[in-house]
Every structure is written in C-alpha cells, then in structure tokens.
C-alpha cells in the first residue's frame, strides 16, 4: 500500500490533520492606527486573570500591534488607569504556589541566630568587683572598731 492510497493518514513528516484556525489581528481588521491607553475596557481583554499581558499566540495580534498594546497597557498601569494585579490575586495572595501537600510536609527548620549574653557577662563581672571593694571596707571598719 503506498502513501497515496492512504487518504486518512498524514504524509510522513506532515503536521497532521488538525490545523488551527489562523488568528487575525483585531487591530489590523479594524484598521486601528493607534492603540489608546485610556481605553481600559479594550486593554483589559488582553490581560490574563493573573494580571499579565497575554502573548501573541493567544490573542492573535500582529507583532506591531502587540508592541503598541504592551506599551499602552504599561502606560495605563503607570498612571493608575489599570491595576498591575487583579483584585482576586490581591486578596488571596499568590494562589499558584499554594499546594495541599505543603500542609502535610513539615516546615523546614530555620536556624535562629545565637545571641551571646555579652551584656549579662559584663554585669556579672561588675558584681564581684563591687563585692571585693565592699569586703575590704568592711574589714577596715571592723579592724577600726576593734582597735
């Protein structure tokens, strides 16, 4: 059986049967000359739920409009028209790092820094000196009383 007799199988080295529909740049289709950074509703379509700018392969924008789109989103974020992070990410924290297995694993022990009792050592050294000074004074007073 030759390759020409097998219509259901792709040719060797071929890409297969499924070919995704080619995405067309929406800005080129609408003939947009400039992407406005003030149009936050339109820019929000090109931001993921995590707050990241969507890549070209997902949005279908051309390279020229993807660069302009990224600059417009960055400008809108800088002047506080758009958030850097989505609201639910701000409330919940970094959900991507949460793992149920993390609770089962013991937390790694962190070595605590040793605090040397330098202050206490000086205080103890000072106390015997004071006693040594007091003791001879007591002896001299006793010797003075006995004399």
UniProtKB/Swiss-Prot annotation:
SUPFAM superfamilies: Ribosomal protein S18 (SSF46911). GO terms for molecular function: small ribosomal subunit rRNA binding; structural constituent of ribosome. The keyword RNA-binding applies. GO terms for cellular component: cytosolic small ribosomal subunit. InterPro entries: Ribosomal_bS18 (IPR001648), Ribosomal_bS18_CS (IPR018275), Ribosomal_bS18_sf (IPR036870). One of its GO terms (biological process) is translation. Keywords: Ribonucleoprotein, Ribosomal protein, RNA-binding, rRNA-binding. It holds the Pfam family Ribosomal_S18. Signal peptide: none annotated. The keyword Ribonucleoprotein applies. Belongs to the bacterial ribosomal protein bS18 family. Part of the 30S ribosomal subunit. Forms a tight heterodimer with protein bS6. Binds as a heterodimer with protein bS6 to the central domain of the 16S rRNA, where it helps stabilize the platform of the 30S subunit. This is Small ribosomal subunit protein bS18. The gene is rpsR.
């Amino acid at each position: 059986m030759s390759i020409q007799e097998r219509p259901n199988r792709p040719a060797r080295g071929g890409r297969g049967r499924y070919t995704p529909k080619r995405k067309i740049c929406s800005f080129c289709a609408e003939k947009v000359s400039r992407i406005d950074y003030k149009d936050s509703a339109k820019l929000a379509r090109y931001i993921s739920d995590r707050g990241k700018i969507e890549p070209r392969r997902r949005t279908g924008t051309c390279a020229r409009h993807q660069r302009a789109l990224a600059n417009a989103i960055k400008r809108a974020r800088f002047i506080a028209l758009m958030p850097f992070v989505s609201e639910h990410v701000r409330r919940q924290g970094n959900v991507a790092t949460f793992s149920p297995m993390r609770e089962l694993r013991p937390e790694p022990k962190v070595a605590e820094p040793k605090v040397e009792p330098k202050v206490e050592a000086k205080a103890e050294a000072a106390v015997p000196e004071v006693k040594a000074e007091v003791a001879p004074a007591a002896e001299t007073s006793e010797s003075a009383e006995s004399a």
